[in-house]
């Protein structure tokens, strides 16, 4: 039964792929990502029977942060899911086209993101969840700047 499966997934250490129909996958992925920290860390890949792929951030829009931005106020929106959706799509495009440079760029972009988090630099939604490092909360622009700096180092 689905309720038992969800309970087992939440208690598990992972290591498996769970294929769901669209609605079930949407509801369960949101619940699971929240149980493990932040919906903003979750990406989604939709694969059609005819081989088409769609990569997306699972969280949708963050309208309250956008309205703060429009007012000139600081926002601390976590861009990780969006970045990983793009990197996943770019990697897949590189694989389909035999473009190894694009695949490597995607790998380096994701590594730069993880290096930033491992250095203790994160948006506000993640700082309280970080263990083992002295965490520093930064706004969206500063977080992206930190990722960019690390990506540029990896591209040299």
Give short role names for the model-derived ranges.
Residues 71-77, 92-156:
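Internal helix-turn-beta structural module
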Residues 4, 8-108, 115-116:
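Glycine-rich phosphate/nucleotide-binding loop
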């Amino acid at each position: 039964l689905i309720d038992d499966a969800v309970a087992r997934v939440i208690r598990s250490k992972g290591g498996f792929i769970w294929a769901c129909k669209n609605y079930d996958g949407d509801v369960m992925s949101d619940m699971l990502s929240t149980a493990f920290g932040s919906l903003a860390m979750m990406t989604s890949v939709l694969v059609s029977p005819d081989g088409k792929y769609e990569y997306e951030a699972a969280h949708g829009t963050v309208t309250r942060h956008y309205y703060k931005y429009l007012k000139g106020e600081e926002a601390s929106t976590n861009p990780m899911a969006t970045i990983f959706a793009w990197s996943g799509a770019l990697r897949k495009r590189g694989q389909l086209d035999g473009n190894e440079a694009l695949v490597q760029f995607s790998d380096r972009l994701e590594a730069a993101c993880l290096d930033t988090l491992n250095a203790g630099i994160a948006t506000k939604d993640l700082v309280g969840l970080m263990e083992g490092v002295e965490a520093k909360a930064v706004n969206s622009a500063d977080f992206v700047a930190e990722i960019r700096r690390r990506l540029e180092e990896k591209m040299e």
